Amino acid sequence: MVLLSELAAATLIFLTTHIFISTLLSITNGRRLPPGPRGWPVIGALPLLGAMPHVSLAKMAKKYGAIMYLKVGTCGMVVASTPDAAKAFLKTLDLNFSNRPPNAGATHLAYGAQDMVFAHYGPRWKLLRKLSNLHMLGGKALENWANVRANELGHMLKSMFDMSREGERVVVAEMLTFAMANMIGQVILSKRVFVNKGVEVNEFKDMVVELMTTAGYFNIGDFIPCLAWMDLQGIEKGMKRLHKKFDALLTKMFDEHKATSYERKGKPDFLDCVMENRDNSEGERLSTTNIKALLLNLFTAGTDTSSSAIEWALAEMMKNPAILKKAQGEMDQVIGNNRRLLESDIPNLPYLRAICKETFRKHPSTPLNLPRISNEPCIVDGYYIPKNTRLSVNIWAIGRDPEVWENPLEFYPERFLSGRNSKIDPRGNDFELIPFGAGRRICAGTRMGIVMVEYILGTLVHSFDWKLPSEVIELNMEEAFGLALQKAVPLEAMVTPRLPIDVYAPLA
């Protein structure tokens, strides 16, 4: 008994001393770090993140607050989980958090961070961003390729119409990936990259999903650099293998495009424009590697994030048929039943837009923003944030915060139809709803993403009635974590045409 009491006393002294020293260490010249879980030696809070880090971090935020600090491996990480906290980092201190931390995804998938997403904030990043906005992603550029979207959507409608006649189910993600990759291919390369659905497009879809999933993993080597060479999770091996596949595909596209340049005289596409303007006034020149990395960004993010949002929206409407019927009723009243939805109709469809916003809120394409890192130490809400601290904004948690949203777990588009919420815009200025991020490093494809989701979702809802296959009793709404938030079980549906047969075709 004496020994046990001595051990207990020793343990108590050790714990008290440990807590006291830890508290002292968290204060630097009177500057206190944000609160957060203590974790373990060396590995820190890594085990606490689990398979669904956005969910785990949201639960921690309820205990530790809107701004919390974790030691993840040997790296410090600060997490913002409310609109005000996100605004402090992404607006007030935007410039200080304008860079990305080094990570395996940037190294092995993005050509050593030679792309636009992971590039250092500087002249090369600005040139990549400028060319992308000017020739593909900006407002004027989007108008210029509106016919491409409409025509490719016609191909998708015809395919779905044929499947409905044959009694075949539609695998939504596959259909969307096929259409979006072809839209982007026509803008970038002047060609549909997939002529027929089949093995090739399914392999491309699997590659995109794998990239967005593996790039979102919390890789041990990123947080404990001395262990990176061991690749304990096998993540880096998978990234290298996947990169070889993408590089082969991009190299083939690049070479075929170069060989057919004579066909585009006077009608340059995106890649032609980038090649023509690869130098800037500051002496920066985009290499072939930079351009291939940019194409990788555009093809992967351009297909996966938008298709995920549309798939989630359709799943929510099939789970809540009254919402689907209300959306169709609005479209029937505004558009009628004799033609397809046009992009110019969308401003007159407030309920459709509310559905899209509600999807962005409840199922943000990126649950955790792509990480940033502090260039210098700073103070946020009275807390000291050291230099080289990684920043993660929990967009998923903000969208489900009961302090911000009434009944946040309910899919209720009507919340965006009246009052203050009706003015909320998802383009980065209203921090209650930032599905594309905010600040300098906001997703370059924000405008395109919103246009694609509203237009394609609206067209699918207006053109077809939707129901689950007969053997599906209850729709699975579980998530699969990654850079993009996928449905764990892909949505499959039976569709029935609602419009005249001539609507289901490409443009004449």
Swiss-Prot record:
Pathway given in the UniProt record? Pigment biosynthesis; anthocyanin biosynthesis
Recorded GO molecular functions are:
flavonoid 3',5'-hydroxylase activity; heme binding; iron ion binding
A Gene Ontology cellular-component term:
endoplasmic reticulum
Key words, A-Z: Endoplasmic reticulum, Heme, Iron, Metal-binding, Microsome, Monooxygenase, NADP, Oxidoreductase
Q: Does the keyword Lipid metabolism apply?
A: no
- The answer, when asked if Iron is one of the entry's keywords, is yes
Q: What is the predominant subcellular site recorded for this chain?
A: other
Which residues are listed for heme binding in this entry? C443
What are the TM regions of this chain, as residue ranges?
none
Give the function comment from the record: Catalyzes the 3'5'-hydroxylation of naringenin and eriodictyol to form 5,7,3,'4',5'-pentahydroxyflavanone and 3',5'-hydroxylation of dihydrokaempferol and dihydroquercetin to form dihydromyricetin.
| Name of the protein in question | Flavonoid 3',5'-hydroxylase 2
- What organism, scientifically named, is this protein from? Petunia hybrida (Petunia)
Gene assigned in the entry: CYP75A3
